[in-house]
Curated annotation (Swiss-Prot):
Catalytic activity: Hydrolyzes Xaa-Pro-|- bonds to release unblocked, N-terminal dipeptides from substrates including Ala-Pro-|-p-nitroanilide and (sequentially) Tyr-Pro-|-Phe-Pro-|-Gly-Pro-|-Ile
Protein name as catalogued: Xaa-Pro dipeptidyl-peptidase
Enzyme class: hydrolase
Keywords from the named record: Aminopeptidase, Cytoplasm, Hydrolase, Protease, Serine protease
Subcellular location: Cytoplasm
Keyword Protease set for record: yes
InterPro entries: AB_hydrolase_fold, Galactose-bd-like_sf, Pept_S15_Xpro, PepX_N_dom, PepX_N_dom_sf, Xaa-Pro-like_dom, Xaa-Pro_dipept_C, Xaa-Pro_dipeptidyl-ppase/CocE
GO molecular function terms attached to this record: aminopeptidase activity; dipeptidyl-peptidase activity; serine-type peptidase activity
Gene name as annotated: pepX
Family per similarity comment: Belongs to the peptidase S15 family.
Pfam families according to UniProt: Peptidase_S15 (PF02129), PepX_C (PF08530), PepX_N (PF09168)
GO cellular component terms attached to this protein's record: cytoplasm
């Protein structure tokens, strides 16, 4: 374990003493440091009628237990404080460590003993993570140190788990959205699942906009998947034009219906554990799936601003600007009289994507988004540089396939009976509009590009993204983060994992940092919390997170690729082509080991190479035919220990998100020995070699200069490492599988790898 503590708010002695007193700690500035520490420790054992017994189970020195120490005349020293602090946090002498000083250095322990600062040390210790993954104060509250009185209690600028999660209110309302996405002449109704504590105070809201939450149709999804085996189409030379179109909602009328009290209820919904953490701390949770999902009406428009509007309507309702009904019969309305109107959205992938879309509307009431692994341009999710390009792990998927997966109205047999014919008509229109034939950018994709509206974002923004996420690739967060207005507060956590959540990792206090931010933004708490704009997980060592100023630098280093002419054959034998088509992982293994059709260049680094931004391959290329698909991957190559990309459970159910509520496992990315690590990758239709809007012809056997931008990253390579550059055509995971008989030639003497370099 190593501490990377970003959530602790430095506190004055007076404020620290006041907060400790509010928690019931009997500390006195006039007492000695030793007496205050003893009083603090005894309070920790509030379950025991006699605190001598648990105190005797701690050691103050290697030859003296804590009870004996406090009964002695010996003075408090750094050695004693450090040893006791480690044990209070759950570290066991002789098991987790033998030499405390060396262990503290390894931990990067954030508290440095000074006898005159004992009150502040105790305050800091309570806000520090235990071995279990919880802060000490959260651990104590989870054991019942504070009663669940359904009121707010704060410590170090963060809300504590004092809301009773055994008496939660679970209710359903139906919000009227200014939409008619299925064109039935009726405004769409949006189902909203609400979970909130019983409280006399107006509550802020965490909203998870999740098209998955009312169920998914995997059968329809699988039937809709596309075959990837097809020839790369030769496109006509042309210029693509699109226009920015404002979304115009339909008019709604003020509701004059009586207020209803008899609301629909529910017993369970698949919740997000970060939401659960905040539910116990006085934040209502709502789950909304939007248009075209079970319990709602309308068509699944998948990614456009009509879908975004269906979530925006819920925020409008929370602020009294939209109508909600008690049921589909619309006989009574219901008001959000329990809400303070301030909202933060949460969730990963599609969920985080909807958060970004919502933020670009500038809707009042949306105070903050926590968007994890989020899409900012749907074109860049299903296409790349004029190519159909599947997200990593999902060959054959497209946006209409996702529509089939998430149109959960068809899971309700009655809805299927009444509406499926119309749904199929609208789905067919969507399938035509996305233009899978060419892979080109068009108006359909432009309407699903949130980057063009990034300037309208006014809420606080928190993004997390994995630099090994080849599903929602790093370009998605790179472009939106760098497009955000300079006037807003923005934060980015870049980790070394894949498409994963990170709130329950051991090495980073993400949960507590979000607590401090949300208390500021949604509860108006003046806690003086300041979070760095960007925090990056170091790829060279375990559990090390560093502040970074920018994602993408202008300083570059050009690496020569060689002097040869290299030929890349596109065609595979029939058996090999079929085998790779059945198992793209076998293709990837062959590719990375230099066994697939490719041009391969290994560069032995003579000095460290700290990459920060978008690597570009500038290549001299020619094709034997009037078409060409170019793929590239950059590897950190050679056997060594690297961080894995999937977090591993260190302990089971050790994190309590409330008071015995919604427990979850503590996880972390661990080192493993492997032969390579993908640093970046990219794909291009050579007909789109100059830009996305220009489709050009490819002259047979004529040299072309191509700039292929790869996925942005931050990655540190060290002197002596090998950088492997792989150039090839068909990628059996991502691109169409064209097995026609053409070849590309690369002139390495006129080609370079252009690398953005991080400053010291």
């Amino acid at each position: 374990m190593r501490y990377n503590q970003f959530s602790y708010i430095p506190t004055s002695l007076e404020r620290a003493a006041e907060e400790l007193k509010e928690l019931g700690f009997d500390l006195d500035l006039q007492k000695t440091a030793k007496a205050n520490l003893e009083s603090f420790l005894r309070k920790l054992f509030f379950h025991y009628p006699d605190s001598d017994y648990p105190l005797s189970h701690l050691i103050a020195k290697n030859d003296m237990d804590a009870l004996s120490f406090f009964q002695s005349e010996q003075e408090l020293s750094k050695e004693v404080f450090d040893l006791l602090a480690l044990q209070v946090l759950g570290f066991i002498p002789g098991v987790d460590f033998t030499e405390a000083d060396a262990f503290l250095d390894k931990l990067a322990f954030p508290i440095h003993f000074d006898e005159t600062e004992i009150i502040k040390h105790i305050h800091h210790l309570l806000a520090t993570r235990c071995k279990s993954g919880m802060t000490l104060i959260d651990d104590l509250v989870s054991q019942g140190m504070l009663t669940m009185d359904n009121d707010y209690h704060f410590f170090n600028g963060k809300s504590l788990a004092t809301f009773d999660t055994s008496q939660l209110i679970r209710e359903v309302v139906y919000v009227e959205a200014p939409l008619d996405t299925d064109q039935d002449g009726q405004l769409d109704l949006i189902k909203v699942n609400i979970i909130r504590p019983q409280s006399q105070k107006p509550l802020p809201t965490l909203m998870t906009p999740s098209p998955y939450h009312q169920g998914i149709n995997e059968v329809a999804n699988d039937k809709k998947l596309y075959r990837m085996e097809k020839e790369l189409v030769v496109k006509k030379r042309r210029q693509i034009t699109v226009e920015d179109r404002d979304f115009i909602p339909l008019e709604t009328q003020p509701c004059k219906l009586p207020i209803g009290q008899n609301l629909e209820s529910f017993s369970y919904i698949n919740s997000y554990s970060l939401n659960d953490y905040f539910l116990a701390r006085g934040f209502a949770n709502i789950y909304v799936s939007g248009v075209g999902t079970a319990g709602s009406t309308g068509f699944m428009t998948s990614g456009d601003y009509a879908q975004i509007e269906s979530f925006k309507a819920v925020i409008d309702w929370l602020n009294g600007r939209a109508t909600a009904y008690t049921s589909h019969s619309k006989t009574h309305q219901v008001r959000a009289d329990w809400a303070n109107g301030l909202v933060c959205t949460t969730g990963k992938s599609y969920l985080g994507t909807m958060s970004t879309g919502l933020a670009t509307t500038g809707v009042d009431g949306l105070a903050m988004i926590i968007a994890e692994s989020a899409i900012s341009s749907w074109y860049n999710y299903y296409r790349e540089n004029g190519l159909v390009c599947s997200p990593g792990g999902y060959p054959g998927e497209d946006l209409d396939v996702l529509t089939e997966l998430t149109y959960s109205r068809n899971l309700l047999a009655g809805d299927y009976l009444r509406h499926n014919d119309r749904y199929q008509e609208l789905l067919n229109q969507q399938s035509q509009a996305l233009d899978r034939q060419s892979g080109d950018y068009n108006q359909f994709w432009h309407d699903r590009n949130y980057l063009k509206n990034a300037h309208q974002i006014k809420c606080d923004v928190v993004y997390t993204h994995g630099l090994q996420d080849w599903n929602v690739k790093p370009r998605q967060v790179y472009e939106i983060f760098n497009a955000l207005p300079s006037t807003i507060n923005k934060h980015l956590f870049l980790h070394q994992g894949e498409h994963v959540y990170m709130h329950n990792w051991q090495s980073i206090d993400f949960r507590e940092s979000m607590n401090a931010l949300l208390c500021q933004k949604l509860l108006g708490l003046a806690n003086d919390f300041s979070l760095p704009e960007m925090i990056w997980q170091d790829n060279t060592c375990l559990q090390n997170w560093q502040e970074r100023k920018v994602f993408g630098t202008s300083t570059i280093k050009e690496l020569d690729l060689g002097q040869e002419l290299l030929l890349i054959d596109n065609h595979y034998g029939e058996d090999e082509f079929k085998a790779y088509g059945k198992d793209f992982r076998a293709f990837k293994a062959a590719l990375f080991e230099g066994k697939a059709n490719q041009a391969l260049v290994d560069i032995l680094l003579e000095e460290d190479l700290p990459i920060n931004g978008e690597i570009v391959l500038q290549l001299k290329v020619k094709s034997s035919e009037n078409k060409g698909l170019l793929s590239a991957q950059i590897l950190d190559y050679g056997k060594k220990k690297r961080l894995g990309d999937l977090p591993i459970a260190l302990t089971q159910s050790s994190i309590d998100n409330g008071q015995n509520f919604s427990r979850e496992s503590l996880k972390e990315l661990l080192f493993r020995e492997d032969s390579y690590r993908v640093i970046s990758k990219g794909f291009m239709n050579l007909q789109n070699r100059n830009n996305l809007s220009s489709i050009e012809t490819i002259p047979n056997n004529k040299w072309m200069t191509v700039r292929l931008p790869l996925q942005p990253t931050i990655y540190h390579l060290e002197k002596g490492d090998t950088l492997r550059v792989i150039l090839y055509t068909t990628d059996f995971e991502h691109t169409v599988r064209d097995n026609s008989n053409y070849a590309l030639t690369i002139d390495l003497s006129q080609s370079q790898l252009i690398v953005p370099i991080a400053s010291n």
